[in-house]
Structures are given as structure tokens and as C-alpha cells.
Amino acid sequence: MITRDFLMNADCKTAFGAIEESLLWSAEQRAASLAATLACRPDEGPVWIFGYGSLMWNPALEFTESCTGTLVGWHRAFCLRLTAGRGTAHQPGRMLALKEGGRTTGVAYRLPEETLEQELTLLWKREMITGCYLPTWCQLDLDDGRTVNAIVFIMDPRHPEYESDTRAQVIAPLIAAASGPLGTNAQYLFSLEQELIKLGMQDDGLNDLLVSVKKLLAENFPDGVLRPGFA
């Protein structure tokens, strides 16, 4: 499980699994990306982060406020080939990102201004290890009626590990089989399902994928013990 201590001490070359050297971003590249993002800060208001995946149940951030909300214009998609963390180059899985169209519900976190760069540096180490996302300022509609500007990690379709085919029948076998140093790919999907249920949120785009992955696991692990890597 990713924790603050893990992120602070992690050697990005090894902590998440074997990452192809050509894909791995240096600390300097991450810092430049963060600086470029902050240079585009739309106003002097607080900085919010939008979590639509594991940031919802495990932010590992120091924040002053959180609120559920909706991002219009983007939807969840398992469109990132996963070769580290919960997958390997030999048996890749799929990781969550955002693609254009639709809407996404999630959790927004307001970061403290006095430690803003420290928190964002940790976040960039977590999310931008290979530069697979485009950190983008977007307007969020919070459930309490406010509209805020937030940093959102959107899939970069130019990234070498971007996968355009996100049909359930294509990606379910990958997710059901993949695992890595951070656990199984399937457990990530199920944690997402559980968090959405807990928050009273619905994402119909995940339904077919959840059904397919659970069916594959039931067929291959009838005793209920998840042993990854069956494919």
C-alpha cells in the first residue's frame, strides 16, 4: 500500500517494480512538470486535487478539506498499460486514467498553501513516475454547491503505454491476471468499486468490466483465493 513514508523514501527505479529506463522520469523532469503546472495556476485561490481512483480511498496527502464532486467532460477508462506497481512487463495489467467525454464523480482535496509544493512533490512522485498523465487545471462542481479549480491527472494519449482499446472483453483478462509489488490489479478495481459504493456514487462504465473480472476470477479460483498470474 502506498503511504507518505513509502513515497518519501521510495527509489523510483525499484520501489514500484522494474520500470523500463526509457519511460522512467527523473526527479528533475517531475519537478519541471510540477513547476509548469503551477505556472498555469488559474487564480490565487486554493489548490485542489481531484481524486477519481486510489486517491479517493488512499490520498496519502495532507489536506485541509475534502469534498465529493463532479468533473464534467471526462470519464474513467482503464487505458494505461500497467507494467509496474500492480503489473509487470511480462504480464501487464491496466491502470485507470481519464479520457475525454462524459463525467466523473470523485473526491476533491484542498491542499494547505504553506506546504503546497511539498505535497505536490509527493503527488508527482506517485502519479508522474513515467509522465503518463497530463496534469490539467479543470473546474470541479463540488457537491456543496461550490465550483473550484483543481489539478486533474488526465491520460496523455501520446504516452507509449497508452492503450486505446478499453473494451471489457479485452482488458478484463489483463486485470484479472496482473500483479506486482503493490498487489493485484483486480484488487485495485474492487477497491474502486467499494469506494464508489461507500460514497454513493455510480459509474456505469465500470459495470461490464467488474462483471467480467469477477467471472474470470471465479472460474480460475473457485476456492476464492486470489492467485494472480493465471493467464
Curated annotation (Swiss-Prot):
One of its GO terms (biological process) is glutathione catabolic process. Disulfide bonds: none annotated. Catalyzes the cleavage of glutathione into 5-oxo-L-proline and a Cys-Gly dipeptide. Acts specifically on glutathione, but not on other gamma-glutamyl peptides. Transmembrane segments: none annotated. The gene is chaC. It holds the Pfam family ChaC. Substrate binds at I49, F50, G51, Y52, G53, S54. It comes from the Bacteria. This is Glutathione-specific gamma-glutamylcyclotransferase. One of its GO terms (molecular function) is glutathione specific gamma-glutamylcyclotransferase activity. It comes from Escherichia coli (strain K12). GO terms for cellular component: cytoplasm. Its EC number is 4.3.2.7. Belongs to the gamma-glutamylcyclotransferase family. ChaC subfamily.
